[in-house]
Curated annotation (Swiss-Prot):
One of its GO terms (molecular function) is methionyl-tRNA formyltransferase activity. It holds the Pfam family Formyl_trans_N. It comes from the Bacteria. It comes from Synechococcus sp. (strain WH7803). (6S)-5,6,7,8-tetrahydrofolate binds at S110, L111, L112, P113. Signal peptide: none annotated. Its EC number is 2.1.2.9. It catalyses: L-methionyl-tRNA(fMet) + (6R)-10-formyltetrahydrofolate = N-formyl-L-methionyl-tRNA(fMet) + (6S)-5,6,7,8-tetrahydrofolate + H(+). InterPro entries: Fmt (IPR005794), Formyl_trans_C (IPR005793), Formyl_transf_N (IPR002376), Formyl_transf_N_sf (IPR036477), Formyl_transferase-like_C_sf (IPR011034), Met-tRNA-FMT_C (IPR044135), Met-tRNA-FMT_N (IPR041711). Belongs to the Fmt family. Attaches a formyl group to the free amino group of methionyl-tRNA(fMet). The formyl group appears to play a dual role in the initiator identity of N-formylmethionyl-tRNA by promoting its recognition by IF2 and preventing the misappropriation of this tRNA by the elongation apparatus. The keyword Ion transport does not apply. GO terms for cellular component: cytosol. This is Methionyl-tRNA formyltransferase.
């Protein structure tokens, strides 16, 4: 089939690669414009643009596709059979959604209608969801409200961060989208109601859970929260959760909540530390112990093990290297919050 592909981050690249390798004709790739990134703030293409150029695909980079009528006309003139959208980052206008005869299909990283909108991977971890997945959804004007053609679930591991979960979902999204293409092609064009019947889609309820945009305040750790809440924030917002260590910003990159009921899901090193400190006996944020695997810190309830972190101006470190870098001693305290 002739496919118009829409995507921006590295998460979308496996789907582009998979469709290209399967022999589908990628008639165009639409992605966000180049942005300044990194310490040098150099103008850099999106991961999807970089890969599309390697594949020799025509690339389009509208700043605002809803306002760019010239770009809309160029894209519609490509006469794609179908549009495939994976984490593009802009809302598509009605004319773009309705132009391909076989529709616009989105690979969404959640179990719809839970976590519609941006950041479904982060929010599934932040809220402690036991599982998530990918849905191949027909796009309509509502935000992630369209009927779902294919869906696959996977469990979320306690010690899995958003990047790791995103990599698994990215591969799953690519596989499901490839499975969806012959089904969509076989159903053919036609009236919407007839197509949905032929495709046997699952219609979503009107009500759903929306993933709100994250703010800077969301990334600040509060040691007065429970160990599990702090851990979910560290893993869900990886690598952005921050606190203060001796007036310097500290990124906390990996933790384990030292909670007895979760012991089976912890590492051997963390499991050996469970139950060694009285719950609530120390002020939040106080260093309780320097272990080979990192720092044990008090919270509201059970303590938490910081396995990996990055002090402002330093390289990331873990275990004993982290303790040496911070020169941490029992009784030292982490700040309640820091500017991200």
């Amino acid at each position: 089939m002739k496919i118009l592909f829409w995507g921006t981050p590295a998460y979308a690249v496996p789907t582009l690669d998979t469709l290209h390798e399967a022999g589908h004709q990628i008639v165009g790739v639409v992605t966000q414009p180049d942005r300044r990134r990194g310490r040098g703030k150099q103008l850099m293409p999106s991961p999807v643009k970089a890969r599309a150029q390697e594949l020799g695909c025509p690339v389009f980079t509208p700043e605002r596709i809803r306002r760019d009528l010239d770009c809309q006309q160029q894209l519609n003139a490509l006469d794609a059979d179908v549009s495939v959208v994976v984490a593009f980052g802009q809302i598509l206008p009605k004319d773009i959604l309705q132009h391909p005869p076989l529709g616009c299909w989105n690979g969404h990283g959640s179990l719809l209608p839970r976590w519609r909108g941006a950041g479904p991977i982060q929010w599934s971890i932040l809220e402690g969801d036991p599982e998530t997945g990918v849905g191949i959804m027909a796009m309509e004007e509502g935000l992630d409200t369209g009927p779902v053609l294919l869906e696959q679930r996977l469990s979320i591991n306690l010690l899995e961060n958003a990047h790791q979960l995103g990599e698994r979902l990215s591969r799953l999204s690519a596989d499901l989208m490839l499975q969806a293409m012959p089904v969509i092609e076989a159903a053919g064009p036609g009236l919407e109601a007839e197509r949905w019947s032929r495709l046997q889609v699952r219609h979503q309820p009107e009500e759903g859970t929306y993933a709100r945009m994250l703010s800077k305040e969301d990334f600040q750790l509060n040691w007065g929260d429970s160990a599990l809440t702090i851990h979910r924030k560290v893993m869900g917002l990886y690598p952005g959760a921050v606190t203060v260590w001796k007036d310097r910003r500290l990124k906390v990159l990996a933790t384990e909540p030292l909670i007895e009921r979760l012991a089976d899901d912890l590492s051997d090193e963390a499991r050996a530390l469970v139950g060694r400190w009285n719950t609530g006996a120390h002020p939040p944020g106080q260093v309780l112990h320097s272990a080979d695997s990192g720092l044990v810190v008090s919270t509201h309830g059970c303590p938490i093990l910081i396995r990996e972190a990055q002090l402002e101006g330093k390289a990331r470190s873990h275990g004993q290297a982290l303790i040496q870098q911070l020169q941490a001693q029992p009784g030292d305290s982490l700040g309640l919050a820091a500017k991200p």
